[in-house]
From Swiss-Prot:
This is DNA gyrase subunit A. It catalyses: ATP-dependent breakage, passage and rejoining of double-stranded DNA. Coiled coil: none annotated. It comes from Staphylococcus aureus (strain Mu50 / ATCC 700699). Keywords: Antibiotic resistance, ATP-binding, Cytoplasm, DNA-binding, Isomerase, Nucleotide-binding, Topoisomerase.
Length: 889
């Protein structure tokens, strides 16, 4: 291999070479490719495209020209890079969803909001828009500097005159080396108003500027949430602006709703947004959506329709879509632009100041250019006036000259004319020697003198020049200004949670034996006197019945503890609200239960982070455990282990405690043990627990509750055959944990085994639920108080094969008292005896009739009322059985 001549070898340290070369490359990218100029808001490629369009005469009043022709001309003369990069830049300037004020008028397929690419450049055509002319206006009047192109054969503008603030009007985005810019678009009317205010008050604050410029105005419209992000971006040049789609909830008949999206955030790909929603629905991360379709068209504009299931809350679904999809996103503002050829982070005021200074420079240079041209013309006219005053001598001198040069020299010497004046006289046509032409020259000369005076005044007085800038900006505002598209909504949207959209109200959540769940307003159930038939609380399936019921607020948490010792969590409003007769939805649609897993206890909790509360667990085999409530604050959708136990055991109940309670554990054979909660050491969430009660053969735990020391509460015992009683808590002595307990009721064939042992104050209502789905709500105070060994009194009359499945306490409220007053009234008979009138109702369910009857009895004759009521119940059951037989036939 031949060696290179020594003179062509330049040894350099590789570290220095890499550093300098990379810096050169970085500056080239920053200055010549990625960042816009603060004055015209354009990158070099955009500036070259617009200048190329102007040079080719592709104005709005001319016909479209092929995009390939435009790209080729720009690439050959000004931008020696790939044709694709030039075409993509031109396409973006033509998209009305990318530019607030498009600078290219495209004809053909220039892409869509779904991310579809534009057609090939050989198919599309383009020309300038009307507003683009304002960027280029006066470019040929020495208003800006021109520089050599890449090969030195052409001249190109270093910046455009930009008669409107394009940097903020259309925004900019670009990634350079070590820095990036992202400037949002704005409303032209607001921007020019801001520039006008700045020109009148150079010390104006950004807060005052924001009175004119409310915030970004995106071409896709949509919403901006709050002004804090806008204010931060305008003050510092950096900030995050929350953008949200415009969506409305429409009724579509049959109690169903749909969500209709008509505007989406800026730079969001609509097709990908729809795919994201579909993915969340498919992965069951968002529930309640039945259909999703894109109905966007040229006639309707953007229209994405989301159909919502009948039992779902459209507001909650929409809020979740905002959180998990591009329906709501942010725009990261980073206002970096080239200032005097160097990248700089600028705020709103600085951007407007630099633009205003640029406009003053443009107007000043244009004025100077016009002044030069006016003076040159006046100089020529002065020569013509001299020639007209001495026309005979001028003609004689010209006739006596042998050549043009001799004639010009003779005119200059004889009449003291300049070379330009002499040449103008020689070029003058004979027809201008008429009197009419002389008058025209005089008029033009006088007008020029006035015009020159005006131009000199503009240059001499900065305020006059500034007023001219204002007038021209006002003219552009009046011609191209429009209403803002993006609405700025004020409020705490950044912290919006689902419950902010849900009214807080008391509700009842029921769970059936076959694991169907639903919620109802607590007022659905009417208070009735003891022995009432009850209200049909749900239309149960065959062999299904309500097994559990809790009352809570829609904003409270519900903890679901299963027989397998796992815990799940929902908000009250997340359980679908259905009609009273509805069976509910499968609980697996709300909670991801494992196989053979059923809910054993539902607990309503307002604050899961509380350090003062505990959960006490009891299993069928008599094991108990105490654990801090805060251990259960973070429960995911798949649930977590709440307690560990042996395979032959299962969780019976869980209670919320304050840490200073007495624990009551009751069994099906009517044994009850009471011991202090403090004897239970708090254990971890997954711990096993300790022995709470020693069970006799065939016995098992059926109830767990708590009571205060020296409590005036009572123990309520309800048996499977509908009997119950109240016994003071203090009748049950404290004992050591792990004992056999003491007798709490006499169990016979008449009343059956115990199904519920709980504590009451006498101020609650009691809901008793049967396996037939019948719910009775009665006042606990109406239940007789008996000793520990008593069997109790009848609380509800049961039909054949019916038994009490569950019992729940609910708080009395004003609405309940009103309903109770409507159901029970007192009257005075003819003999002066006060009569009790009670309406007993078997409420309407599919296939059943409504049975009502007024029962009259003396006030203290409770046994008489029960006897009449039981007779009524028998007749109701006969009617129901007859109706059932007719249905079978």
């Amino acid at each position: 291999m031949a060696e290179l001549p020594q003179s062509r070898i330049n040894e350099r340290n590789i570290t220095s070479e890499m550093r300098e070369s990379f810096l050169d490359y970085a500056m080239s990218v920053i200055v010549a490719r990625a960042l816009p100029d603060v004055r015209d808001g354009l990158k070099p490629v955009h500036r070259r495209i617009l200048y190329g369009l102007n040079e080719q005469g592709m104005t709005p009043d001319k016909s479209y020209k092929k995009s390939a022709r435009i790209v080729g001309d720009v690439m050959g003369k000004y931008h020696p890079h790939g044709d694709l990069s030039i075409y993509e830049a031109m396409v973006r300037m033509a998209q009305d969803f990318s530019y607030r004020y498009p600078l290219v008028d495209g004809q053909g397929n220039f892409g869509s909001m779904d991310g579809d690419g534009a057609a090939a450049m050989r198919y599309t055509e383009a020309r300038m828009t009307k507003i683009t002319l304002e960027l280029l206006r006066d470019i040929n009047k020495d208003t800006i500097d021109f520089i050599d192109n890449y090969d030195g054969n052409e001249r190109e503008p270093s910046v455009l005159p930009a008669r409107f603030p394009n940097l903020l009007a259309n925004g900019a985005s670009g990634i350079a080396v070590g820095m990036a810019t992202n400037i949002p678009p704005h409303n032209l009317t607001e921007l020019i108003n801001g520039v006008l205010s700045l020109s009148k008050n150079p010390d104006i604050s950004i807060a005052e500027l924001m009175e004119d410029i409310e915030g970004p105005d995106f071409p896709t419209a949509g919403l901006i949430l709050g002004k804090s992000g806008i204010r931060r971006a305008y003050e510092t040049g950096r900030g995050s602006i929350q953008m949200r789609s415009r969506a409305v909830i429409e009724e579509r008949g049959g109690g169903r709703q749909r969500i209709v999206v008509t505007e989406i955030p800026f730079q969001v790909n609509k097709a990908r947004m729809i795919e994201k929603i579909a993915e969340l629905v498919r992965d069951k991360k968002i529930d309640g959506i039945t259909d999703l379709r894109d109905e966007t068209s040229l006639r309707t504009g953007v229209r994405v329709v989301i159909d919502v299931r009948k039992d779902a809350n459209a507001s909650v679904i929409l809020n979740n879509l905002y959180k998990q999809t591009p329906l709501q996103t942010s725009f990261g503002v980073n206002m970096i632009a080239l200032v005097n050829g160097r990248p700089k982070l600028i705020n709103l005021k600085e951007a407007l100041v630099h633009y205003l200074e640029h406009q003053k420079t443009v107007v000043r240079r244009r004025t100077q250019y016009n002044l030069r041209k006016a003076k040159d013309r006046a100089h020529i006219l002065e020569g013509l006036r001299i020639a007209l005053d001495h026309i005979d001598e001028i003609i004689s001198t010209i006739r006596e000259s042998d050549t043009d040069k001799v004639a010009m020299k003779s005119l200059q010497q004889r009449f003291k004319l300049s070379e330009k004046q002499a040449q103008a006289i020689l070029d003058m046509r004979l027809r201008r020697l008429t009197g009419l032409e002389r008058d025209k020259i005089e008029a033009e000369y006088n007008e020029l003198l006035n015009y020159i005076s005006e131009l000199e005044t503009i240059l001499a007085d900065e305020e006059v020049l500034l007023q001219l800038v204002r007038d021209e900006l006002t003219e552009i505002r009046d011609r191209f200004g429009d209403d803002r598209r993006t609405e700025i909504q004020l409020g705490g949207f950044e912290d919006l949670e689902d419950e902010d959209l849900i009214p807080e109200e008391q509700i009842v959540i029921t769970l059936s034996h076959n694991n169907y769940i639903k919620r109802l307003p607590v007022s659905t159930y009417r208070a009735q006197n003891r022995g009432g038939r009850g209200v049909q609380g749900m239309n149960t399936l065959e062999e299904d019945f309500v097994s559990q019921l809790v009352t809570l607020s829609t904003h409270d948490h519900v903890l679901f503890f299963t027989n397998k010792g796992r815990v799940y969590k929902l908000k009250g409003y997340e359980v679908p609200e259905l009609s009273r007769q509805s069976k509910g939805i499968p609980v697996v649609n709300a909670i991801e239960l494992e196989n053979d897993e059923v809910i054993s206890t539902m607990i309503a909790v307002k604050d899961l982070e509380s350090e003062d509360n505990f959960l006490v667990f009891a299993t069928k085999r008599g094991v108990v455990k105490r654990s801090a409530l805060s251990n259960f604050s973070r429960i995911n959708r798949n649930g977590k282990i709440a307690i560990s136990f042996r395979e032959d055991d299962e969780l019976i109940a869980v209670r919320l405690t304050s840490g200073q309670e007495d624990i009551l554990i009751g069994t099906s054979h009517a044994s009850l043990i009471r011991f202090p909660e403090s004897t239970l050491r708090p254990l971890g969430r997954t711990a096993t627990g300790v022995k709470g009660i020693t069970l006799r053969e065939g016995d098992e735990v059926v109830g767990l509750d708590v009571a205060h020391a020296n409590s005036v509460d009572e123990v309520l015992v309800v048996t499977e055959n509908g009997y119950g009683k109240r016994t003071p808590v203090n009748d049950y002595r404290l004992s050591n944990r792990g004992g056999k307990g003491i007798k709490t009721a006499t169990i016979t064939e008449r009343n059956g085994n115990v199904v519920c042992i709980t504590t009451v104050t006498g101020e609650e209502d009691l809901m008793i639920v049967t396996n037939a789905g019948v719910i009775i709500r009665l006042d606990v105070a109406d239940i007789s108080q008996n000793g520990r060994a008593a069997q109790g009194v009848r609380l509800i009359r049961l039909g054949d094969d019916q038994f009490v499945s569950t019992v729940a306490k609910v708080k009395e409220d004003a609405e309940d008292e009103t309903n109770e007053d409507e159901q029970s009234t007192s009257t005075v008979s003819e003999d002066g005896t006060e009569q009790q009138r009670e309406a007993v109702v078997n409420d309407e369910t599919p296939g059943n009739a409504i049975h009502t009857e007024v029962i009259d009895s003396e006030e203290n004759d409770e046994d008489g009322r029960i006897e009449v009521r039981q007779d009524f119940m028998d007749r109701v059951e006969e009617d129901i059985q007859q109706s059932s037989d007719e249905d079978e036939e």
